Amino acid sequence: MIVKSAYRKVSGSYTLFGVAAVIDPAGYRAGVAIIIFNRQKKLFWAKRVRQNAWQFPQGGVNEGETLKQTMFRELKEETGLDPEDVRIVTVSKQWLYYRLPKHLIRHRSEPLCIGQKQKWFLLKFIGNETKFNFNLSEKPEFDDWQWVSYWHPMKEVIVFKKQVYHRALKAFASYVFRHRSEKIEHGQEPPPPPSLSA
């Protein structure tokens, strides 16, 4: 799926770090989000630079990019990983949306961006942990990382992303914990998803 420049006719694009970013007619920036899991069914969880805020890698689609190209570009820029370090397990069937809080919306921007719509990629990590490197971008997103239990991100993600994280994790759980016998034998079955009010 290529995000075409036709978007510009109905909505528009704006320049972010010198690159045209795609915004749909409703004001949502098109992007990808990435969940990486390892052999122990733990998830890659990264800390934003100089903040006590943790999240999954994510980023916006540049005009003319496919979603897969965007995902691999963001993967490299934000984590240092290459395509051979991961295997694509699945991609969300639908766009998952989140709206920005009012104080984060740049009301003077044209076109107006009110949030993000994301395709979520589930990747299995098959590389070496020494490949993780946050210094490949001029403006690194992260400065620390850890492997965490499956639902752990729901405890720490910023409140306005909580619902979209919940939907993605719920949709991907059956891919991470594929076989019932494996779940029981290794004690790796995730607990039921936490409620969004928690």
Where are the predicted features?
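A short gly/proline-enriched turn/hairpin at secondary-structure junctions
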Residues: 55-59
